[in-house]
């Protein structure tokens, strides 16, 4: 699974994702489209898993959204990832640029945000994630409250039989 994930990630960085869109089922796209129609901004809350880059790029072909990211320390990988972000998303916002995140949400953008990171005890709480106590960032509710954005859960996975991918979007 990890090997497949690396290939999927490389494909999303280097190839056009529209060519493989037939292998994707998007459940709940109408929730994101409806929320975007209100121009209130949408916080797309997701998780970091091996299908993130590929499924995110495919979803962005349907509804463009901004992404938050952490700069990679390896300059070659960062360069490749930057080109991919520029190709697949309207805006890529560094994780510590909170003003831009809030400004874009207030303008009615959708912004992908992954709270499944450990930024230390001051900014995290430990909650069960697949029955394992895991650090989770607590800023999600503050982002939504300050910006007035609606929150939509964005899930994605590869089908067990490797026949394709499922992207899920919750109701706000």
Model regions and ranges:
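Membrane-anchoring hydrophobic helices of lipid-metabolizing enzymes
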Residues: 1-43, 78-89, 159, 167
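Short, conserved clusters of charged catalytic residues that mark active-site
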Residues: 27, 96-97, 135-139
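Generic beta-sheet signal
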Residues: 40-46, 109-113, 149
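A cross-family acyltransferase "interaction/gating" segment
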Residues: 73, 110, 117, 121-172
């Amino acid at each position: 699974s990890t090997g497949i994930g690396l290939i999927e990630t490389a494909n999303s960085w280097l190839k056009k994702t529209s060519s493989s869109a037939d292998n994707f089922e998007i459940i709940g796209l109408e929730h994101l489209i409806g929320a975007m129609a209100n121009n209130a901004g949408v916080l797309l809350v997701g998780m970091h898993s091996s299908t993130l880059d590929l499924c995110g790029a495919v979803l962005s072909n349907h509804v463009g959204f901004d992404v938050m990211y952490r700069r990679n320390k390896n300059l070659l990988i960062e360069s490749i990832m930057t080109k991919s972000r520029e190709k697949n998303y309207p805006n890529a916002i560094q994780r510590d640029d909170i003003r831009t995140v809030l400004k874009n949400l207030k303008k009615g953008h959708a912004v992908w945000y992954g709270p499944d990171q450990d930024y230390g005890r001051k900014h995290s709480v430990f909650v069960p994630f697949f029955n394992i106590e895991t650090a989770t960032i607590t800023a999600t509710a503050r982002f939504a409250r300050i910006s007035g954005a609606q929150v939509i859960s964005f899930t994605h996975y590869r089908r067990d039989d490797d026949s394709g991918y499922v992207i899920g979007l919750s109701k706000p």
